[in-house]
Design a protein with these regions (language model features):
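Absolute protein N-terminus
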Residues: 1-2, 287
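Structural beta-alpha unit
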Residues: 41-45, 50, 72-124, 223-266, ...
């Protein structure tokens, strides 16, 4: 059976990812592994010696002991929080009839823990921002690009609001990771029966290479049973794609994480985070 690895932090973005996972799991005939990672920095319990150095050598023993006790309590609270978040995830999947759910709690750093479980996963899911999204990029958000860069599996980056997936937009530039995404798209049962749009953005509307890439994607999509709407549009990839998503009411964007044309700027460097954070729909990326 296929496995979906869902990274959660209990935030509103993570809640949305549960709904997308519940939609995808039966279409992929997949189980769901829900991973919560407690930041190791919040679990380190200080000794009285360490604390005396930080608050002054003359601090009373009673005060130091109280501070150590508080550190222990904090570690317990963090553990309890993880337990509650994972149990909430299980309860949600129970209500959706998803029975094959595995809860995983690790202490460390998300990027490091993620590698341990990625090998058995077929698809990675995480929210595009984390628990501190109201104030700054949160835990998941801060790790998002590192995970996308490091993952050997397709990554579904979910938006805050769940939107039923009805229309797909595949942004294709012919790059190697785009070809992997094309192969995943045509082979996966997840997207069968959905409306598919294929978009290639070029510097010129009559660019022969861009036309060839679009023809390739269209032919493979048709062979897989899709009836794709094809578009070749001249312009800036980020602006063109964002406008197309809005205009056509697209519910899922698919693209390679690396390309060999200007489309690569969508997912390399600072523009990646900006696009993913500003997107109101989920984005499926393939390295």
């Amino acid at each position: 059976m296929k496995r979906i690895l869902l990274c959660t932090d209990g935030s509103s973005f993570a809640q949305s990812s549960y709904r997308y996972a519940a939609w995808l799991a039966p279409r992929l005939n997949a189980g769901v592994d829900v991973l919560y990672v407690t930041d190791v920095r919040s679990q380190k319990v200080a000794s009285t010696g360490n604390l005396s150095g930080s608050i002054g050598i003359d601090a009373s023993k009673e005060l130091l002991n109280k501070l150590v006790d508080l550190e222990h309590e904090k570690a317990k609270v963090n553990h309890q929080r993880a337990k509650l978040i994972l149990e909430e995830a299980r309860q949600f999947f129970d209500t959706q009839g998803i029975q094959n759910v595995n809860l995983i709690h690790e202490t460390g750093f998300l990027v490091d823990s993620f590698h341990e479980f990625e090998t058995t996963a077929d698809l990675i899911m995480l929210g595009n921002r984390g628990e501190a999204a109201e104030f700054a990029s949160g835990h998941l958000g801060a790790n998002l690009e590192r995970i996308v860069r490091a993952s050997h599996k397709p990554c579904l980056v979910t938006s805050r609001q769940f939107k039923p997936i009805e229309r797909l937009l595949f942004a294709y530039d012919g790059g190697q990771s785009g070809q992997k995404m094309l192969q995943f798209l045509v082979q996966s049962p997840a997207f069968k029966g959905l409306e598919l749009h294929i978009l290639t953005v070029a510097k010129k509307a009559d660019d022969p290479e861009a036309i060839a890439h679009l023809n390739e994607a269209e032919q493979k999509a048709k062979a897989a049973g899709f009836k794709p709407v094809r578009q070749l549009i001249q312009g800036d990839p980020e602006q063109v794609i964002a406008h197309y998503v809005e205009e056509k009411n697209i519910s899922l964007l698919l693209m390679g994480a690396y390309g060999h044309s200007r489309i690569r700027h969508l997912v390399i460097g600072s523009t990646t985070a900006q696009m993913l954070r500003s997107s109101h729909i989920p984005v499926l990326l393939f390295r």
